[in-house]
A protein has these predicted regions:
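Bacterial N-terminal signal peptides
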Residues: 8-18
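Bacterial N-terminal signal peptides that target proteins for export
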Residues: 1-8
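Beta-strand-rich interaction surfaces with strong enrichment in secreted/lumenal proteins
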Residues: 71-73, 83, 115-119
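Short, solvent-exposed coil/turn segments
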Residues: 77-80, 111-113
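Primarily secretory-pathway and cell-envelope proteins
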Residues: 20-66, 102-185
Length: 185
């Protein structure tokens, strides 16, 4: 009897873990727009011989203590496109990227974080850019063991076209369509 209870608990735990992994990989659908002041932050990231699964997107000068306060959710899709929806206005920073094998920490101190702050305004659509992470020294990845290069492609338009399909049925899709129209002109 105890073994059955143990196996059922193990099965439930595995299901919960797999659902968390799906959310971090962008398999979960984006949430609908919660208010007109909510912002959308998006971009693209790739790593040489590595698959980025998480973007550490944090509000600057905010302490996140699990389970009470969590950082904004960032969906990372298999093609490297990422998005964070329903972002409140404020100052934010990309603290790093995580892959299945490595952590790419972009800032190790408050001073380094301060140099990369960007401001989100109410109702903003903020494109962070497209980046490549190149490991310069093999072994344990620490700050300085990799190089971040800005890419020309995919550009904002290509990233938004991918997100247009991913946000089907939400108010974000209309907002993305308007931004795509602006970029065509």
């Amino acid at each position: 009897m105890r073994r059955v209870v143990y196996l059922v608990g193990l099965a439930i735990g595995m299901c919960m873990l797999s659902s968390c992994a799906a959310i971090s990989r962008g398999d979960a659908p984006p949430d609908d727009m919660k208010s007109p002041d909510a912002a959308l932050v998006y971009g693209y990231v790739e790593a040489d011989n590595d698959n980025i699964v998480q973007v550490d997107f944090l509000q600057y000068n905010r302490l996140y203590v699990s389970p009470f306060k969590a950082p904004p959710r960032v969906l990372v899709f298999d093609d490297g496109v990422f998005m964070a929806e329903n972002i409140k206005p404020g100052n934010y920073v990309i603290a790093g990227f995580r892959s299945e094998r490595n952590n790419y920490n972009l800032s190790r101190s408050k001073r380094q974080s301060y140099q990369h702050i960007f401001r989100i305004k109410p109702g903003d659509m903020h494109y962070l850019g497209s980046y490549n992470l190149h490991v310069t020294q093999t072994g344990k990845i620490e700050y300085g063991d990799f190089k971040v290069t800005e890419l020309e492609r995919p550009g904002e338009r290509e990233v938004l076209m991918r997100l247009y399909d991913a946000t089907e049925g939400t108010a974000w899709q209309d907002k993305i369509a308007r931004r795509l129209k602006e970029l065509r002109q």
